[in-house]
Curated annotation (Swiss-Prot):
Keyword terms of this UniProt record: Cytoplasm, Nucleus, Translation regulation
Species whose genome carries this gene: Xenopus laevis
Regions of compositional bias (Acidic residues) in chain numbering: 232-241, 368-379
Gene Ontology MF term list: ribosome binding; RNA binding; translation elongation factor binding
Biased composition (Gly residues): 162-174
Oligomeric and partner information: Associates with ribosomes; promoting ribosome stabilization. Interacts with eef2/eEF2; promoting ribosome stabilization.
Protein name as annotated: Intracellular hyaluronan-binding protein 4.S
Keyword flag Nucleus: yes
A cellular-component GO term for this protein: nucleolus
Amino acid sequence: MRLETMKQTPSSPVNIAMQDSFGCAVENRFQQLLDDESDPLDFLYQSAVEVTHRKKKEEGAAKKNANQKSGKKESQKDRKAVVVGGSTDVKVTQQTGQKRAPKNTEKVTQNENVDSQVKVDRTERRTAFREVRPNIMDRSAEYSIEKPMEIMDQDKQMRNYGGRGGMRGRGRGGFPRNTESDNLRGKREFDRHSGSDRARMRPEDKRGGSGPRNWGSIKEAFSEIEAVPVEEQVETTETEATEEHGKVSEETNDDGFSQEMSLDEWKLLQDQNRSKTELNLRKPETSVPSKAVVIHKSKYKNNISENEEESQYCFRKPVNDITAQLDINFGSLARPSRGRGGGGGRGRVRREEAFPHDVINVLADAPNPDDPEDFPALA
């Protein structure tokens, strides 16, 4: 849906020429005009309500201004006029009667007064912004040590930088006005546990010997010595004398001279003086008990030679081991042929081996389970 010119412009040669040369096509894509379903009577009612509210506000403001003027004190000029003219009754009637609404001239004077108050407030704010605040003054007074001259010079240099072309990104001011990083405006201060300027040692503490990192004063040492009673000192001196006398008596000889000895002799003396610990040790019983009885003797124990035992001392063998009595001969076994694949020249018959194949019965007879010699573990 396209809508051409919505309103007709006033007839003028310029407008007519513009309409002929230029055209504008308006397309209502979102159908905003069709969605408006409100009643025009509602709009009229709302506008009337708004007008009444405005009138009430204006009347209330006028009453407040009239009350403020009536509550002001009379100036000296008004008093003189009353005394000279003698028209006190007129004044009373005016005050007791209905309050009149302020005129346009009075409104103008009120606006002028408001403008002057705003100007005064702005000037006061500017002066207050440049003044030093009370919290900064208190903090500077808390330090007992004066600021050194080097820091003062640095502060002056930083202030001189703050001209018109000072640091970029700061506008006209250059450096920030708060040169001291500690005195940040509007932030609380907390005492550091690790130590700060306030926690440092004061000169009074240092003179008196108190405070951290101080070795004390001479007065404290004398006061501690005086506080100890005389009897305790006498007892301590007596105990020290007895201990020293005992040590000297041990080291000295009968003649009263100190004895020189070597390290071994001194160790012997120490061992003699040292208390010895007595241990109740038992020796193993070598004697055979009288009630011991031999159950059976092995058959093969006596046949084993001593030489074989000496040569094979490292291996633990049972008493009835018969492996040493077996005669094993590996010479009767067939030897493999050497060389390439088997043997002699061409066309010859394979010769027989010189060693006969004798079958040797290595295995013994089956053991008898009833005999304890054959089954020693079952006995």
